Amino acid sequence: MLRIEKESAGHTTRLRLSGRIQSTDIDELWAQMDDDAIRIILDLDEVTLVDVEVVRFLSDCEDGGVVLVHCPLYVREWIIRERAEGAQT
């Protein structure tokens, strides 16, 4: 189960995510990110498990300027692999 804590300060919004993130959570994450913040930070320190759709979502977020902090190593490596596979197609 995903838990989201939202903190806003000035033009920055930080979403602290914890638990398991599934593809069914992506719409809620988009909704939480849809504000007037210039800078959005996703803090993944307490994320325990993700699926492939979430990895693609995180990659797209990062490509769009969202900052990923405390990204678990396995998630970072998976993002890199997904990008490499996407570049080959």
What are these regions (language model features)?
Residues 1-89:
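STAS-like cytosolic regulatory interaction modules
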